[in-house]
């Protein structure tokens, strides 16, 4: 039974998503339906958390919009995600960057990975 489930999940996994980690800046293109039209909406920010659970993997992206912090959780293998573009690699030592919620301005910057 579980082999059948694993096989079905394996078929649904997306391979076009680049490898990224916490602290990286990414641009996620999301398919949005408005009325009868479908368009792409970009959401660019810092990945503050990742949850690796196979087909149920997710990641959280945080950005500052009009002085207000906005976080959005994306399902990694969702068909609503058109693409994920890696903009910049960040050098961090934590798995979850929730402390960025309390920081603002220059204090919330993340050092760029140089290699």
Curated annotation (Swiss-Prot):
GO terms for cellular component: cytosolic large ribosomal subunit. It holds the Pfam family Ribosomal_L19. GO terms for biological process: translation. GO terms for molecular function: structural constituent of ribosome. Gene3D superfamilies: 2.30.30.790. InterPro entries: Ribosomal_bL19, Ribosomal_bL19_CS, Ribosomal_bL19_sf, Translation_prot_SH3-like_sf. Keywords: Ribonucleoprotein, Ribosomal protein. It comes from the Bacteria. The keyword Ribonucleoprotein applies. Belongs to the bacterial ribosomal protein bL19 family. This protein is located at the 30S-50S ribosomal subunit interface and may play a role in the structure and function of the aminoacyl-tRNA binding site. NCBIfam families: rplS_bact. This is Large ribosomal subunit protein bL19. It comes from Aeromonas hydrophila subsp. hydrophila (strain ATCC 7966 / DSM 30187 / BCRC 13018 / CCUG 14551 / JCM 1027 / KCTC 2358 / NCIMB 9240 / NCTC 8049). The gene is rplS.
């Amino acid at each position: 039974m579980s082999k059948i489930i694993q096989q079905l999940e394996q078929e649904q996994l997306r391979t076009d998503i680049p490898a990224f980690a916490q602290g990286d800046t990414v641009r996620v293109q999301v398919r949005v339906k408005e009325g009868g039209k479908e368009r792409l909406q970009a959401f660019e920010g810092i990945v503050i958390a990742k949850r690796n659970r196979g087909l149920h993997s997710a990641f959280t992206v945080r950005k500052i919009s009009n002085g207000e912090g906005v976080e959005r959780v994306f399902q990694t293998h969702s068909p609503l995600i058109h693409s994920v573009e890696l903009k910049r690699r960040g050098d961090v030592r934590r798995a979850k960057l929730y402390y960025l919620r309390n920081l603002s301005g220059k204090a919330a910057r993340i050092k760029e990975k140089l290699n």
